[in-house]
């Protein structure tokens, strides 16, 4: 058992908080975001978001004040790198250069960090190379988020991209297969996170998500998308299995199959053995079944690789990145 953190993950449609000490998830809170608070993955008002976080914390009876935050992709740059072996000082000097194709000017306006994945040794046992996850984030964005958490009554202690959060969950986890993918069925998109030999490799984004299921239900029942979302969650009048909705499931399953095949084509010596499903869409059994029928791999829940939990799987399955953000912190 280590120090307890509150993991925070802000998505396009909801904010997720998870309290974890690295071994056990003790509390989860999920709140739907007001319309317009997050647009295209970017927080529109940090003050309004801070007030929402403060309200969520109050409604859950309080959480540890040290926050581990999943930085949105719009505010960070991520790369997996293979570099010659070098000292920590040399690596810190070299990291800005590795982002030169993404940051054309003002590299000093960014903060850089990394997580080591592994080292390669030569015949004599001396280090020859190293694999790592590298991230760059704007100093202004980090300052804005630091102030946001301060206003919410929390302290920003850890900031990391979602790729590092998933690496914390899967890397070195005896319950996770080394060659696997995490499928996040989120509101606007479906994202596949691929792992190679237990290390985060790459992500693929499918531009179909829960909102498309909502739209199909809205069309069938003649309601707006917000009502359709409630119909979906409660399976009102078997809305989860209507013909129109099954068509969306099949579209998602086909695109997932294509993404898996494309990854296999680029990595002919690797076989993805399992897909761990998460996100709100993973609670839709017909959707997961459609993916399992189409993909020639084992499909299971992300709960297979999550820490033990005092809260329900229906909650933890929706916030794996928030949980992952709290793990391996200072450990």
What would you call each of these model-derived segments?
Residues 71-172, 304-308:
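Active-site neighborhood for divalent-cation/phosphate handling
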Residues 38, 139-168, 199-238:
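Glycine-rich phosphate-binding loop plus the immediately following alpha-helix
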